């Protein structure tokens, strides 16, 4: 909440990437790849695009039409909020893994992410899409 107040951000995403010692290596690699792609597409610095710890102002959610229903929705919100000009920031948070198995499959979900990016027309080979043009 403090980050949103001090930066006037419309959306704040938690950032677990400053302390990754308890994070599985495959998760670090996949997260860095996905976050790098989303940072380029959105024009915002998104160090941890897959973090579910988020603050999203109501007007952001009211302004974007969401179409995804799985983990891609995290990326869809970032892309669409950035295209609408909303301010996106990140805030450091603690990485906590309590031994429970993740429901994320790094291979399958990465492939779904790639398909989602292509579907959105926001692959880096589409420079107009990066700027948010339709």
Where are these predicted regions, by residue range?
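Acceptor/aglycone-binding surface of glycosyltransferases and processive sugar-polymer synthases
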Residues: 1-71, 97-114
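Aromatic/hydrophobic pocket-lining residues that form π-stacking "cages" and hydrophobic walls in ligand
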Residues: 77, 117
């Amino acid at each position: 909440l403090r980050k949103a107040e001090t930066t006037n951000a419309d959306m704040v995403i938690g950032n677990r990437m400053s302390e990754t010692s308890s994070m599985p290596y495959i998760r670090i690699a996949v997260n860095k790849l996905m976050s790098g792609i989303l940072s380029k597409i959105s024009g915002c610095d998104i160090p941890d695009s897959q973090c579910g710890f988020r603050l999203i102002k109501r007007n952001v959610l009211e302004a974007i039409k969401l179409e995804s229903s799985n983990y891609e929705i995290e990326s869809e919100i970032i892309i669409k909020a950035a295209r609408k000009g909303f301010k996106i920031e990140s805030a450091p948070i603690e990485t906590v893994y309590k031994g429970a198995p993740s429901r994320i499959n790094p291979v399958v979900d990465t492939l779904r992410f790639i398909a989602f990016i292509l579907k959105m027309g926001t692959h880096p080979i589409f420079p107009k899409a990066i700027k948010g043009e339709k």
